[in-house]
Structure formats: C-alpha cells, structure tokens
A protein has these predicted regions:
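Solvent-exposed interaction patches of small proteins and small membrane subunits
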Residues: 1-134
Length: 134
C-alpha cells in the first residue's frame, strides 16, 4: 500500500504540472509543452490505476485500455468517465506517433477535460484507499 500511496502522490504532482500549463496563455510553445505534460501525466495516472487494481482489487491488467475497463468494473470510473478515458488514451497515442499541427490543436482543446477526468480518477482511488485502511 505504501508504494501505491507514493504513486498517487507522484500522479497528483504530474497532474498539477499539466493544470499549470493549461492555465498559461496559449502559444505554440505552451501548447506543445502542455501536450508533453499530458503525455507523462496520463502515463503516470494509468500506471497508478494499474497498481491500484493489482494491490486493492487483485486484478492484473497490462494495457491502458484494460486498466480503464478494470477501473469501470471496480466502479472507480462510471460509464461516461470510462468512455472519456478511452478517448484520452487515444489522444495520448496520437501525440506520440506523428506531429500534426491540426491534431495538436484538437488535443490541446481537450486537455482541460482530460485533466479534470484524471483528477476525478485519482480522487476515486484516494477515497477507496482511505476507506480500505480505516
């Protein structure tokens, strides 16, 4: 559980850097930096969820999509959040394979929603851990 608590703390810090970037004035440099922060925040959050599912729910899942589905089954995410999380996973994959200006703009526009979803996801894990240890 201690390792999971550490992962949650790291994920919250990563998310804070994304939120900070999103709040800045939009420039091409800030857009690209925000997308980069989204990439590492997403990676940190889904891997934290993977660890949570393993430790707390005894589910061993390997891919981001499987972890998202597992979080839905464990009721950490509702149906709408799960669909949004799968879309977020697609956005993350699109950001790393090629650079496309129009795509960067589209993904940048979705970052506030992605950040909100990751915040809710982390809060759900925090709440479950708190209730499990009390």
């Amino acid at each position: 559980m201690e390792r999971l608590s550490e992962r949650l703390a790291v994920a919250r810090k990563a998310l804070a850097t994304l939120v900070e970037a999103i709040r800045e004035r939009k420039t091409p440099l800030n857009r690209d930096a925000s997308i980069q922060r989204f990439q590492y925040t997403y990676e940190t959050v889904w891997k934290t969820a993977q660890n949570y599912l393993s430790v707390v729910e005894q589910l061993t899942l390997g891919s981001p999509s499987a972890v998202i589905r597992g979080c839905f089954q464990a009721q950490l995410l509702d149906e709408e959040q799960s669909r949004s999380a799968l879309r977020m996973a697609q956005d993350r994959n699109l950001t790393v394979h090629t650079y496309n200006e129009a795509l960067a703009e589209e993904i940048y526009a979705r970052l506030p929603g992605h950040a909100q979803l990751m915040e809710e996801w982390l809060k759900a894990m925090d709440a479950r851990m708190t209730s499990a240890t009390s």
